[in-house]
C-alpha cells in the first residue's frame, strides 16, 4: 500500500530524496512552486514512504524571511516563502523566520 491515513498526516511513497520541512507535491516529489499536498515530517530517501503533515501546525523550512501571519507558498526548492498572490497558499507563519535554515510553524 502506498498511502495510509493517520489523523493529521498521511504517508506517500516519494520519488526523490526529501528533507524534513520541505513541501511535498501530490506525485510524491518536492513541491516546486506548485500546490503542495503537505510537509514532509522526516528526511526520506527516494522510493521510501514519507510521513506528510496535511493538517495542523508543523515546522517548515523557509526560503526567505517571513513574518508571523504571512501566508506561505512553496518556492522552487520546496521551502516556504511569503505568498505574493491570493490565488492559493499553504498556510500561515506562526512565528518569524529569517533565513533558509530557520524552521517555523506553519498550518
Q: Model regions: which residues?
A:
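Surface-exposed, low-hydrophobicity beta-strand/loop segments enriched in small/polar/acidic residues
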Residues: 1-107
Amino acid at each position: 500500500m502506498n498511502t495510509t491515513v493517520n489523523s493529521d498526516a498521511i504517508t506517500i511513497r516519494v520519488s526523490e530524496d526529501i528533507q524534513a520541512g520541505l513541501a511535498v507535491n501530490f506525485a510524491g516529489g518536492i513541491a516546486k512552486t506548485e500546490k503542495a499536498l503537505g510537509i514532509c515530517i522526516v528526511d526520506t530517501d527516494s522510493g521510501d514512504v514519507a510521513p506528510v503533515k496535511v493538517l495542523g501546525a508543523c515546522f517548515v523550512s523557509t526560503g526567505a524571511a517571513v513574518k508571523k501571519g504571512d501566508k506561505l507558498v512553496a518556492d522552487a526548492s520546496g521551502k516556504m516563502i511569503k505568498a505574493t498572490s491570493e490565488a492559493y497558499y499553504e498556510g500561515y507563519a506562526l512565528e518569524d523566520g529569517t533565513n533558509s535554515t530557520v524552521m517555523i510553524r506553519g498550518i
